[in-house]
């Protein structure tokens, strides 16, 4: 399963959850609006002249408060959902089969080679065996195994002199993709 398919699956799930949240928020807004209208009716019956002077003001305040409450609830729910989608995406990537991680490490090392042609490569404990096998390939003969690091996956490459380092960990890569696509994802999920 490719990364695009995983992200598409997660987006679809997020879209369905977002619709549910928006519908619940709309129902809550309607409840608040109904309560506000009932309050206005009580005031209207007891102090008609006063209500006529202040009706527009009260309705505006109640609507603004209701909209603010609903908007805050929806935004909080959207943020929670986006955080869940991010975590699910990372978890899904991390749980991919060994062949995926081997392809990813090979691809990331080729990309790092453009910036650091020789150096040490570090990875997660789970990927140590995979990385050592990849480093045996002739195209990566200028690299040595660095160390096991605390990461979800991917690699960190450091030049031999320690002057340069590129972080191609899954989390860093996903953060870059996430930040660049966050608006698109948000628009897609909550449109």
UniProtKB/Swiss-Prot annotation:
Entry-linked SUPFAM superfamilies: V-type ATPase subunit E-like
Swiss-Prot/TrEMBL keywords: ATP synthesis, Cell membrane, Hydrogen ion transport, Ion transport, Membrane, Transport
Cellular compartment(s): Cell membrane
GO CC annotation: plasma membrane; proton-transporting two-sector ATPase complex, catalytic domain
Principal location listed in the UniProt entry: membrane
Keyword Kinase: no
Subunit structure: Has multiple subunits with at least A(3), B(3), C, D, E, F, H, I and proteolipid K(x).
Homology family: Belongs to the V-ATPase E subunit family.
Protein name, entry field: A-type ATP synthase subunit E 1
Annotated gene: atpE1
């Amino acid at each position: 399963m490719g990364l695009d398919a995983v992200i598409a699956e997660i987006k679809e799930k997020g879209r369905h959850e977002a619709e549910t949240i928006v519908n619940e928020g709309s129902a809550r807004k309607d409840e608040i609006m109904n309560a506000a209208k009932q309050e206005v009716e009580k005031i209207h019956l007891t102090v008609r002249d006063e209500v006529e002077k202040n009706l527009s003001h009260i309705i505006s305040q109640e609507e603004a408060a209701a909209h603010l409450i609903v908007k805050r609830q929806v935004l909080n729910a959207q943020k929670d959902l986006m955080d869940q989608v991010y975590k699910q995406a990372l978890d899904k990537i991390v749980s991919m089969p060994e062949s995926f991680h081997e392809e990813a490490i090979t691809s990331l090392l080729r990309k790092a080679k453009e910036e650091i042609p020789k150096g040490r490569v570090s990875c997660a404990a789970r990927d140590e065996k995979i990385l050592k096998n990849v480093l045996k390939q002739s195209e990566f003969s200028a690299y040595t195994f660095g160390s096991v690091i605390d990461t979800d996956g991917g690699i960190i490459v450091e030049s031999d002199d320690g002057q340069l380092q590129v972080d191609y960990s899954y989390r860093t890569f996903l953060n870059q993709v996430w930040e660049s696509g966050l608006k698109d994802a948000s628009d897609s999920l909550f449109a």
